[in-house]
A protein has these predicted regions:
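Beta-propeller domains
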Residues: 2-60, 66-68
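PLD/PLD-like phosphodiesterase catalytic module centered on the HKD motif
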Residues: 43-216
Length: 216
């Protein structure tokens, strides 16, 4: 790991030591982790994510992982799965649909992990590898490990949260729609009761408020 600066990692390799190293870096995070996983979360990463931490870890998936219960098992793991909005009364004006240009990856094909991006020692791991066994052992891939560059970390974090919030909202809409039309109604309240969950210590919304306000 470079003290400050950029290092490179290349594949294919004869073993999974590189993935194990990424997993150790994730496990040593101090304030937050942000991960994109186009083809599911590797078992080595799942071993880290299944153990609770006192900070938030965000995972953005192309499709539902085979171990969704494990990923959601830790209360401070925030997981979003890519999707489009279901049909609704507004579809004549704002119906979402896929382009159909790619049959293997519909939504998310970026590969990066961000560790402690808003701290003094941010780490961005990004490149062409899928954080998978195949991409490590068989594919011709390259990754950059960028340490201590706050500007790069800010850019990657902004793009991650743009995508995460976009798809997390669509996941909530699908979940509401599955429970029936009455449960799907959610009107704005005419008081400040909505903010209570952002001030309940230890909850995801509480920690998210503090983290993005600079209290980390």
């Amino acid at each position: 790991l470079p003290a400050v600066g950029t290092g490179a990692a290349f594949s294919p390799r004869s073993n999974l030591d590189l993935l194990r190293w990424y997993a150790r870096l994730m496990d040593k995070a101090n304030t937050a982790v942000f991960l994109t996983a186009a083809f599911g979360v590797n078992d080595l990463f799942e071993e880290v994510l299944e153990h609770p931490k006192p900070y938030l870890r965000y995972v953005l998936l192309e499709s539902a992982d085979r171990d969704m219960d494990l990923l959601n098992g830790s209360p401070l793991n925030e997981v979003a799965v890519a999707n489009i909005l279901p049909h609704n009364e507004f579809e004549r004006w704002m119906e979402e649909h896929l382009s159909g240009l790619n049959t293997h990856v519909k939504y998310i094909h970026t590969k990066y992990m961000i560790i402690d991006p808003l701290g003094e020692d941010p780490l961005v791991i990004t490149g062409s590898a899928n954080f998978s066994d195949a991409s490590t052992r068989k594919n011709d891939e390259n990754m950059l490990v960028i340490r201590g560059d706050n500007r790069v970390a800010d850019i990657y974090l902004s793009e991650f949260m743009r995508l995460f919030n976009h798809f997390q909202f669509r996941g909530l809409v699908h979940a509401r729609a599955a429970t029936g039309p009455e449960s799907a109604r959610s009107f704005l309240v005419p008081n400040d009761s909505w903010k209570a969950r952002y001030y309940q210590p230890g909850t995801p919304k509480y920690l998210e408020r503090l983290y993005f306000a600079g209290h980390h």
